[in-house]
Amino acid sequence: MSELAGADFLGAFAVVTRGDRTLFVANERRIGGGSVRTWDLPGGRVEAGELLHEAVARELREETGLVVRGIPHFLFVQEGERVVAAGRRHAWRSFFFAVEVVEGEPVAGNEVLGVRWLSRGEMERELVAPYHDSFLQWLRGGGQWFRSAWRD
C-alpha cells in the first residue's frame, strides 16, 4: 500500500454532447490557495464496490438529473498528483466516458451550483483549472492517457 493510499481519488466523468456543445456543471474549488468557481464535466468519486460505468451514471444523475442510456464509451484517463497544504501528496485517477442520455434537460442537483452547455470556443476560455488541461488536450487531438500535477 502506498503512502498515498489513504487520500487517493478514483473518479468517473461524463462527456455529454448535444450538437456542438458539451455539458458542464459549476463547482466551487480550492485552487492556488483561494476559492474559485469552475465549470467541470459532471462526475466524481467512485464509491466502494461501484464499477466505473455505474459511477458515471450515478454522478450524472445526481448532478444534472439526466439518465444514461446504455453503457458509456471510454474516452481517456487522466492521472496525477495534487500537493496540498504542508506538502501532503494525493494521487488521483479520473476516467472519462462519452455517454448518451435519455431525453430531457439538465437541472442542477444539490451537489453543483449550476449547469451549462459550452461550445468549443467557450471551453477554451472557461476551462482554466489545472485539471482541465487533459480534457482540452484530448479535445484538440485525442490520446487516451494524460498525466498532470497541481498544487493548492
Which residues are covered by each model-predicted region?
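Nudix hydrolase/Nudix homology domain
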Residues: 37, 106-152
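Conserved Nudix-box catalytic region and its N-terminal flanking loop in Nudix hydrolases
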Residues: 21-62
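A generic structural micro-feature
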Residues: 4-8, 35-38, 87-93, 112
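Short helix-loop capping/hinge motifs at secondary-structure junctions, enriched
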Residues: 22, 103-107
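Active-site segment of metal-dependent pyrophosphate-handling enzymes
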Residues: 65-103
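Conserved N-terminal beta-strand and adjoining loop/helix that marks the start
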Residues: 1-23, 98
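Short, well-ordered beta-strand micro-motif
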Residues: 16, 96-100, 116-119
